[in-house]
Amino acid sequence: MTESNIKKVALVGGGVIGGGWATRCLANGLEVVLTDPRPEAQDYVETMVADAWPVLEDAGLVSENKGELHFAQDIAQAVQDADFVQENVPEREELKISVHEEISQHAREDVVIASSSSGLLPSRLQARCAHPERLMIGHPFAPVYLLPLVEIVGSEQTSQTAIAQAGAFYRSLGMRPLHVRREIEAYIADRLQESLYREALHLIDQGVATVAEIDAAVTGGPGLRWAFMGTFLAWHLGGGPGGMRHTIEQFGPALELPWSHMKAPELTDELKERIVDGCEVESGARAFDEMERRRDRCLAEIQKVLKEHWYPPEEDGWPPMATDR
């Protein structure tokens, strides 16, 4: 975890995401000032913090000194002395544009402002900002206090200095910032999730599988690998000693088969090499058999954790087959 000069964070919006940010910041000893026009927001956030705290403590994610949580009446009061601003209002573009216009009028000029938007373009949110160069997307995943990914997305107006400052701050919170290289709607992770979701809807609509069976297909197979390897490294290791090159040669032609409802890109030689090279860089100097051992240990430990903390007693969480009903 890196150090940060940010000591006071303003949160605009206190729903699931805003409350999650508050919890993570408090666990890292920061002062948090939150504003939300809803009268129930304060109780909601305080309850989220209290409920999450034992889990964070058991996981060793709480600093020695718990941060302080304050509630402000409006945006101006919340952001005026903040070192960092994270906006978490509902995903409506015009609302966010208006909120960021107000934030930019009251926050210090040197303060980075991030939006938790899950799909909007930062260039659109900058439309009425006094200092658009400091505004970007900082898209987390719920529960924010546990999941480390945060996608940082800037526009042509966003300064690289501001992006670097945001990345350093998120790292100081124990998160894993991912800088999206180009401004694009829905960024990276949600696009991947959406692709899987669309295909799952097709399978349900065609009567191929139930919701539980589709979830089981993910959690019992690729999902366990994805938790620590991702898509490409899993395929790289699945190709045996030949790695991704062997996987592409063996399964590449299957991309042309009409199995899914998403059109795949043409698998050109250039694209093949980019994928292979990327996998080899990611796996680094680790030997193939070493990676296999590490993968197997991770898979075993993940399943132990799921069995102990997720599934009900005497159940394994797997849906019954049709012949068992």
What are these regions (language model features)?
Residues 37-40, 55-112:
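Rossmann-like NAD(P)-binding element
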Residues 38, 131, 159, 209-213:
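Helix N-cap / loop-to-helix initiation motif
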Residues 2-5, 28, 175, 206, ...:
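NAD(P)-dependent Rossmann-like dehydrogenase/reductase catalytic/cofactor-binding core
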Residues 144-153, 173, 178-208, 216-233, ...:
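Active-site-proximal catalytic alpha-helix in oxidoreductases
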Residues 32, 85, 113-114, 135:
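Hydrophobic/aromatic residues located in beta-strands of well-ordered beta-sheets
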Residues 115-182, 186, 190:
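Rossmann-fold dinucleotide-binding core
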Residues 1-55:
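NAD(P)+-binding Rossmann beta1-loop-alpha1 motif at the extreme N-terminus of oxidoreductases
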